[in-house]
Design a protein with these regions (language model features):
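Flexible, surface-exposed loop/gating regions in the mature catalytic domains
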Residues: 201, 388, 488
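CBM-like, beta-strand-rich accessory domains located in the C-terminal region of large
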Residues: 360, 450-704
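Carbohydrate-active enzyme catalytic cores, enriched for enzymes
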Residues: 256-443, 494-495, 607-614, 629-704
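Short, solvent-exposed loop/turn elements at domain surfaces
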Residues: 47-50, 58, 400, 408-410, ...
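Mature N-terminal, pre-catalytic/accessory segment of carbohydrate-active enzymes
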Residues: 2-63
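Aromatic-lined, polymer-binding surfaces characteristic
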Residues: 38-40, 46, 50-53, 59-299, ...
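Catalytic Cys-His active-site segments of thiol-dependent hydrolases/isopeptidases
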Residues: 444-449
Length: 704
């Protein structure tokens, strides 16, 4: 034995052990007897399983795709050499492991007996070559390694399933040789997990660990299997404890969430099916979060090192068939997860795949998405939209304001307010930023991951900087720059019909404090209130990005105009900025929603040498030109900043000050923030104050 089962935790306890994430029981559980097949199904399930492969169009398409992966007419390639190009080596190991898995599945569920036998022979041939070539001569720690540990997790799971399918047909001699090959790689991963990723427990630790866990369950009678599984659980728990919030937010961003999902979803099925350990309930908040945070297209945000991603919740829907969920008053979680995927617009990702060959998982060379879709699909599941309140306030720090779960029509609104504790990997300087989607179009945007790769110089020169996000800097410093497990505190939250909002706070180190409130008013427009409290002199900069639109100016109003594209229909965003003693300038910055689809677009930078009075930004989405909507800004130096908005027969006043008396449009108060919305008769529809001792509206005392 190279290691005991005791924890090997090299991470600082004050950072990696203290976040709100989750873990599954660390004690490894293996079956009393190794049995095959068992990872995805049992032998007794084969007849029923084959019927599901043609149950509907979705299943038939995935079955066809799986059969294409198992091409008996395609000769096997020779193993690459140690000096071959990185891409050649990487693609070889991915393709060989996928082919082994596909042929093995076809050997059980393919056509007639002769065809199945041919697939079985091919699968055996592939398994007897598993991990041939230079893999053990190459170092996974090398930057850009062809055998990076993040790939090895998928290769392990592919070979595990292949062996699981054909093991009962193997001769003792072939079985011994194949087990030796698979065990060698499992032992290599076991010994090197913490060498490859010695510090932060990010996805480079968890992905190979989930693969190691699957192989341990496959070779459960191996003398080292218990140790492999223990190490896998230990390492993956480090990741889920630190990078996930208790309510499911993944702090490396949507891209790495889906990238990791390609390994943890198979492991969850394998552990449940082989050992009877059901960890799906522990992971439930992750899949609920995907539904809670998705926009009207069904896309997860491109926050942190991320591109837009769909919600592949269909992969686990069947596992939650009878699970109660906060997302619906009566329907099980399985129906909500089925709905979320069925109502995801996959067209941008299919367009990307058609051009580049890459699917949305980030693991296209290593992970056969269609095969897992085939094995997890249940055509009998209903699709039911959530009937929970559409506005979501996650304790992990993300807030979503939306008009409905399903609407993508005119009047559609979605704003994500991001205030999550900063993790130490794939982070961007985006604290308290926001993303706006409205009228079905992406408007106020996050600039995204990079043009196409982690290694691209533009990623650190632009994409992960504060200027690429809808956020602020003070004296050149972004908010909450350093890793922390402290979620930005919420100062207040208001939830009224017609007025919803929240204020979160952050710091610019010891230099200044920042409070940002975002209000959604009349189900229509948004107002952002920024209050900075300097502790020393410094320049404040605010950045406002309008997505893939052209920018024009009409007096105090800025207008982003969007053409119909793969991200949404034609639309406009009308914006006003009220920032006393500050200068607003137009700049250009690059934006990427989908890998490779990048271009420069205009954004606004507001700069103030001194910050004395709150800054306000008003955002009014529209399908086209404004109709009966006017905005007037009011500024009183060192006292308050305000917007007076007339929309149809309604008038709304939003003002923010320094606790000095405000008297405006019949409103009198000493509040730091006040919002009053009235109809044509003067009736108050909404009113809100923050830190006020009095409020009078049209001479009537509201407070005290």
């Amino acid at each position: 034995m190279l290691e005991t089962l005791s924890a090997r935790d090299q991470a600082p306890a004050d950072l990696y052990q203290s976040y709100s994430g989750f873990v599954i029981p660390a004690a490894p559980v293996l079956p009393a007897q190794e049995t095959h097949p068992s990872l995805w199904f049992k032998a007794a399930d084969l007849s029923a399983l084959k019927v599901t492969f043609t149950a509907d169009d979705f299943a038939r398409a995935r079955w066809t795709a799986t059969q294409k992966l198992a091409d008996l007419g395609k000769p096997l390639p020779p193993a690459p050499g140690v000096k071959d190009k990185t891409e050649v080596i990487h693609k070889y190991y991915g393709a060989m492991s996928i082919a082994a898995r596909a042929h093995a599945l076809l050997s059980l569920l393919g056509g007639d007996e002769l065809v199945r036998a041919a697939h079985c022979r091919r699968a055996e041939e592939l398994l007897l070559r598993a991990y041939d070539g230079p893999i053990f001569q190459l170092d996974s720690k090398d930057k850009g390694s062809a055998v990076d540990e993040i790939y090895r997790g998928s290769w392990l799971q592919n070979y595990a399933h292949a062996y699981d399918c054909i093991q009962p047909t193997l001769s003792p001699e072939a079985d011994k040789l194949i087990r030796e090959r698979l065990a060698r790689e499992a032992q290599c991963v076991y010994e090197n997990l913490y060498e490859w990723t010695p510090d932060s427990p990010h996805n480079h630790l968890s992905k190979p660990a989930w693969g190691l866990g699957s192989m341990a369950l496959t070779l459960s009678s191996h003398p080292q299997a218990k140790f492999w599984l223990a190490r896998a659980l230990e390492a993956t728990n480090k990741n889920t404890r630190y990078f996930f919030s208790g309510d499911g937010i993944y702090r490396e961003g949507s891209h790495y969430l889906v990238f990791s999902l390609t390994n943890f979803v198979p492991f969850l099925y394998h552990y449940r099916n082989v050992s009877g350990v059901d960890a799906f309930p522990t992971f439930q908040p992750v899949f609920e979060m995907m539904v809670q945070v998705r926009n009207s297209h069904g896309w997860l945000p491109n926050i942190e090192d991320s591109y837009l991603r769909p919600t592949p919740t269909h992969l686990v829907a069947a596992a939650y068939r009878d699970r109660v969920t906060k997302l619906h008053s009566s329907a099980p979680l399985s129906e909500i997860l089925t709905w979320s995927y069925q109502h995801s617009d996959l067209s941008p990702f299919e367009q990307e795949r058609g051009g580049s060959g890459f699917n949305y998982t980030g693991a296209s060379w290593d992970y056969p998405l269609e095969l897992d879709e085939l094995l997890t699909h249940d055509a009998t599941l209903r699709a039911t939209a959530s009937n929970a309140a559409p506005n979501v306030f996650l304790a992990g720090g993300q807030t979503v304001l939306r008009n409905s779960w399903a609407s993508a029509d005119a009047g559609q609104r979605y704003l994500l307010f991001h205030g999550v504790a900063v993790a130490d990997n794939h982070n961007h300087d985006d604290q308290l930023s926001f993303i706006l989607e409205a009228e079905g179009q992406l408007m106020c945007s996050d600039s995204g991951y990079s043009r196409g790769t982690y290694a691209g110089a533009e990623r650190t020169a632009w994409y992960n900087t504060a200027a690429a996000h809808n956020t602020l800097t003070f004296d050149g410093r972004p908010a909450d720059k350093d890793p922390t497990n402290a979620t930005p505190p919420v100062s207040f939250r208001v939830e009224q019909p017609g007025l919803v909002g929240e204020e979160k706070s952050a710091t610019f180190g010891p230099k200044a404090a920042w409070h940002r409130a975002i209000f959604w008013i009349a189900g229509d427009f948004f107002v952002v209130v920024d209050r900075v409290e300097p502790k020393q002199p410094g320049e404040t900069k605010a950045y406002l990005h309008g997505g893939r639109g052209t920018l024009t100016t009409d007096g105090p109003r800025r207008i982003w105009t969007y053409s119909a594209d793969r991200y949404g229909p034609a639309a406009k965003l009308h914006a006003w900025i009220a920032a006393p003693e500050a200068l607003v300038t137009e700049k250009s910055g690059e934006l990427t929603y989908i890998k490779g689809d990048y271009a420069p677009f205009p954004y606004l930078e507001t700069t103030g040498a001194h910050f004395f009075t709150p800054w306000l930004t008003l955002l009014k989405p529209a399908a086209g030109e404004l109709q009966d909507f006017t905005v007037r800004s009011e500024k009183a130096a060192n006292q308050h900043t305000a917007f007076v908005v007339r929309s149809g027969q309604e008038k709304t006043v939003i003002a923010a000050g320094n606790r000095a008396a405000i008297s405006l449009e019949g409103i009198e108060t000493d509040a730091e923030i006040v919002v009053v919305r009235r109809d044509a008769t003067g009736k108050i529809l909404n009113q809100f104050v923050h830190h006020a001792t009095y409020l009078r509206v049209d001479g009537h005392a509201i407070l005290p």
